[in-house]
């Protein structure tokens, strides 16, 4: 198999809305006018066409994100199409809408479920804004149940943790050891102009503080870290309007719509960094 000359995995942020309000979220898409979208995302046929274009171009893995992607009414349809076109399929979710019906419905279609878990403390999650409708907060026990069910239904589990001023002193070793994710991505909270900079003083941490969190969890073999520099420009991402976008300059900048100019032309408008993608461990056994 030839090695692609472009980043071979893509994140499709299907939908703008979310049922939580994490202060350091970089994907609020404040420039996306909801009135131009159906329920905050592309209409079904357009979303399917974007997925088809991405698959036909040669992307090998697609991660459906948001907002909160489980709010997207045609989530199953886009996952099924991606799977049928031979892509590895992944979902990034806050876990609030995962249940037995979801696991059964997506069996054989969805390969990975990534759960965003920043803290095991109710108080910390509330401070972060990781609370459903602002007040329904997950505790450690809730996350343990989610992880167990993902394993029980034979999905591959990944956990994403954003390290910020709120949680940088936390110890998650025992939880991670019990949750047994195949991959634990640990991100330094990333400031993005126009998305989360209003809360910058609340969540921003230094490189040293991030390193201290990593050092505390150095025994976790599945940990993959990403600091601010490693994150910028190393992801191929599609926004809820069906445009590629990048964060390389510290703000979100979008391409022309994929369905208007085609995947190749839209991708050429971006300055994604394939070397950075590989350096951060972006290619793995997916």
Curated annotation (Swiss-Prot):
It is an enzyme of class 4 (lyase). It catalyses: GTP + AH2 + S-adenosyl-L-methionine = 3'-deoxy-3',4'-didehydro-GTP + 5'-deoxyadenosine + L-methionine + A + H2O + H(+). The keyword Lyase applies. Its cofactor is [4Fe-4S] cluster. Disulfide bonds: none annotated. CDD domains: Radical_SAM. One of its GO terms (molecular function) is lyase activity. Keywords: 4Fe-4S, Antiviral defense, Iron, Iron-sulfur, Lyase, Metal-binding, S-adenosyl-L-methionine. Pfam families: Fer4_12 (PF13353), Radical_SAM (PF04055). Residues 2-223 form the Radical SAM core domain. GO terms for biological process: defense response to virus. [4Fe-4S] cluster binds at residues 18, 22, 25. Gene3D superfamilies: Aldolase class I. Its EC number is 4.2.-.-. Expression of pVip21 in E.coli (strain MG1655) confers resistance to phage T7; prevents culture collapse upon infection. Catalyzes the conversion of guanosine triphosphate (GTP) to 3'-deoxy-3',4'-didehydro-GTP (ddhGTP), probably via a SAM-dependent radical mechanism. Overexpression of this protein is not toxic in E.coli, thus modified nucleotides do not affect bacterial transcription machinery. Belongs to the radical SAM superfamily. Viperin family. This is S-adenosylmethionine-dependent nucleotide dehydratase. The lineage of its organism: Bacteria, Pseudomonadati, Bacteroidota, Saprospiria, Saprospirales.
């Amino acid at each position: 198999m030839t090695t692609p000359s472009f980043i071979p995995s893509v994140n499709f942020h299907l939908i703008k809305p979310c049922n939580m309000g994490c202060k350091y979220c970089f994907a609020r898409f404040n420039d996306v006018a909801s009135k131009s979208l159906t329920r905050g995302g592309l209409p079904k046929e357009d979303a399917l066409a974007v997925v088809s274009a991405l698959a036909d171009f040669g992307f090998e893995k697609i991660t459906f994100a948001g907002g909160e992607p489980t709010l997207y009414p045609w989530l199953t349809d886009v996952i099924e199409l991606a799977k049928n076109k031979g892509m590895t399929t992944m979902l990034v979710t806050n876990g609030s809408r995962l249940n037995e019906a979801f696991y059964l419905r997506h069996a054989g279609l969805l390969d990975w479920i990534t759960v965003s878990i920043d803290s095991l403390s109710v108080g910390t999650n509330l401070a972060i804004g990781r609370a459903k409708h602002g007040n329904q907060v997950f505790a450690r026990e809730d996350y343990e149940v989610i992880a167990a069910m993902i394993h029980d239904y034979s999905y591959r589990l990944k956990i994403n943790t954003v390290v910020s001023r709120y949680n940088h002193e936390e110890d998650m070793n025992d939880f991670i050891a019990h949750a047994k994710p195949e991959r634990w991505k640990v991100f330094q909270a990333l400031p993005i102009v126009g998305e989360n900079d209003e809360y910058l003083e609340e969540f921003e941490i230094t490189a040293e503080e991030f390193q201290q969190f990593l050092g505390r969890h150095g025994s976790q073999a599945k940990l993959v870290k990403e600091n601010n520099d490693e994150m910028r420009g190393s992801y191929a991402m599609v926004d809820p309007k069906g445009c590629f976008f990048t964060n390389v300059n510290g703000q979100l900048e979008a391409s022309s719509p994929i369905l208007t100019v085609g995947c190749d032309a839209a991708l050429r408008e971006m300055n994604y960094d394939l070397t950075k993608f590989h350096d951060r461990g972006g290619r793995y056994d997916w």
